[in-house]
Design a protein with these regions (language model features):
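Single conserved hydrophobic/aromatic residue that forms the stacking wall/gate
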Residues: 1-13
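Acidic/polar loop patches that form or flank catalytic/metal-binding clefts of enzymes
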Residues: 16-19, 67-75, 163-166, 207-225, ...
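Conserved beta-strand elements of the Class I
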Residues: 28-31, 101
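Solvent-exposed loop/turn segments at secondary-structure junctions
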Residues: 34-37, 76-80, 105-110, 168-173, ...
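Glycine- and acidic-residue-enriched helix-capping/strand-helix junction motifs
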Residues: 35-64, 115-145
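An anion/phosphate-binding loop that grips the pyrophosphate of nucleotide cofactors and donors
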Residues: 96
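Catalytic cores of nucleophile-dependent amide-cleaving enzymes
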Residues: 133-137, 141-192
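Intrinsically disordered, low-complexity Ser/Thr/Gly-rich stretches
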Residues: 217, 225, 230-232, 236, ...
């Protein structure tokens, strides 16, 4: 229960159709390479797991609604560009009322590898691992790999509402994706109970209160991009795009709303230090319970240190 609650604090960065209603007899298509893969729910250097020890996104959704209302198709892999599953995914989406696409990346090690007597892994030219993140895995771009973006775009043409769940170990670019989907949940690696936690968020049993601990860039050309860059005489500007990230550090949405009021600031100054105490009143003004991350940003306008 503790694990499920912690993972439920994942970030919702777009939520125009969330939360979904339970027991409404609507067909749900669950599609994507991260929808039903236990190791893709976990981080790098994960030890071998039993199937029963990890709840995938698909299993979590099935635990929440009638199994007959859930249609699953993998669709594509993380990196492999084989098109063998595309048609099944399109058929599943066409027969559903709403589509949940579980995409992203993976740090999953391949525990099915065979090894030589020397200990070296046998490599097959026909096998392309899902792994695109973790130690020793660098990227030249931050786009969704393989056919993932193409699959999102093809399903968008069907006119069905799309909820995108991103399971991943690094920030990924959302340009070309935001306009194709109706909601985005940034789940990172949600862990062993991730499927149940994700279903709680999707169906409104838990209000996602997480906020981004990084900034998500608009392109790799913006890197490095973070919330507290050193102030210089010239601010970063680009000829091709704006200088601010797509989603800033601390960003996140909620199923409810909060109102701040009565802020009080007190100073306790000494010869060597200055302690600032800040108090603020927060009221939940919405219809759902929820958590709020109070964020305070400070900037030293004049400092003797750089």
């Amino acid at each position: 229960e503790i694990t499920t609650r912690l993972v439920g604090s994942e970030m919702c960065i777009r939520d125009s159709i969330l939360p979904l209603k339970k027991n409404c007899s609507k067909k749900i298509a669950v599609i994507g390479p991260n929808a039903d893969n236990i190791y893709n729910m976990l981080g790098d250097y994960t030890a071998p797991q039993t199937t029963a020890s990890v709840v995938t996104a698909l299993e979590g959704i099935k635990n929440k609604v009638d199994n007959e209302d859930v249609i699953y198709a993998k669709g594509c892999a993380i990196r492999d560009t084989s098109r063998i599953g595309i048609r099944d995914a399109l058929n599943a989406a066409a027969s559903a009322d709403v589509v949940i696409m579980v995409m992203g990346g993976s740090s999953a090690r391949d525990f099915s590898s065979e090894y030589e007597e020397t200990g070296a892994a046998k490599v097959s030219a026909n096998l392309i691992s899902d792994m695109e993140s973790g130690e020793g895995y660098d990227r030249a771009t931050l786009n969704l790999m393989g056919l993932q973006l193409e699959l999102i775009q093809e399903i968008k043409k069907l006119g069905k509402p799309i909820i995108l769940v991103l399971i991943k170990g690094r920030p990924l670019l959302l340009e070309g994706i935001i306009q194709e989907v109706d909601a985005i949940i940034d789940a990172w690696y949600p862990g062993m109970q991730g499927g149940n936690a994700l279903a709680d968020v999707l169906f409104g049993d838990y209000n996602p209160g997480g906020r981004l601990s990084i900034s998500i860039p608009r392109s790799v050309g913006q890197l490095p991009v973070y919330y507290n860059p050193k102030r210089t005489g010239n601010r970063n500007k680009y000829l091709e795009e704006v200088g601010v990230p797509r989603y800033c550090f601390g960003y996140g949405l909620s199923y409810t709303s909060f109102e701040y009021s009565d802020m009080e600031v007190t100073l306790n100054e000494t010869a060597d230090d200055c302690i600032v105490n800040i108090r603020v009143k927060i009221v939940n003004t919405g219809q759902k319970s929820g958590d709020e991350v109070v964020q305070l940003y400070i900037c030293d306008d004049v400092s003797s240190y750089t």
